A protein has these predicted regions:
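Conserved beta-propeller blade repeats
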Residues: 1, 19-38, 64-82, 108-123, ...
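Beta-propeller blade-edge and WD-like acidic-aromatic loop motif
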Residues: 1-16, 34, 38-59, 77-78, ...
Length: 177
């Protein structure tokens, strides 16, 4: 089972935040007040948030298919995530209350894990060359790509390489962008 836990960097007891499983942590709001995560409830994986101190979980998405990889934008205005709601894994964003869901990528790649630059103008993501459905396995042909937030244009940062699960699951920007 997968739950989300919290502990102090100084040590001490570990506190469980989520009461249902599976729950997969992905991000913390810029003000540290909320966590955002992917969880399976009622047979579907959707995006949830809750207070960083625990409490009631708030469902932010409810689409058929996998919603995963949620991450707050540095300005705290949006939550970016990947979704299979169109039949292809693409990058989406929504306001932090779950409203105004907007598709950000529209290509034939399977796009995962958008990580927003500190200046909120672009995002790096991993793209599988061949459609992987609702999976993000390791050991596949992938590229790192850059999404322009304003124009929604995506450009290659790398040529294809052997990677996948674990390549860029967490935020990896330099604080200066």
């Amino acid at each position: 089972n997968s739950f989300i836990y919290k502990t102090s960097l100084k040590g001490g007891p570990t506190e469980i935040l989520t009461t249902e499983s599976p729950s997969y942590w992905h991000g913390v709001s810029p003000d540290n007040k909320f966590i955002v995560y992917c969880a399976e409830r009622e047979g579907n994986y959707d995006i949830y948030k809750m207070s960083s101190n625990g409490g009631k979980e708030i469902r932010l998405s409810n689409a058929k298919g996998l919603d995963d990889g949620p991450e707050y934008s540095p300005d705290g205005k949006y939550i970016y995530f990947n979704s299979y709601r169109t039949g292809k894994m693409q990058i989406w964003r929504m306001f932090t209350d779950g409203s105004n869901k907007e598709q950000m990528t529209f290509d034939n790649y399977s796009n995962w894990f958008a990580h927003i630059a500190p200046h909120n103008e672009s995002a790096v993501l991993i793209s599988y060359i061949k459609d992987q459905g609702q999976r993000h396995p390791f050991g596949r042909s992938v590229k790192l790509r850059l999404l322009d937030i304003e124009t929604k244009e995506v450009s290659d940062l790398t040529s294809s390489f052997f990677g996948g699960q674990g390549t860029i699951n967490v935020h990896s920007w330099n604080p200066e962008g």
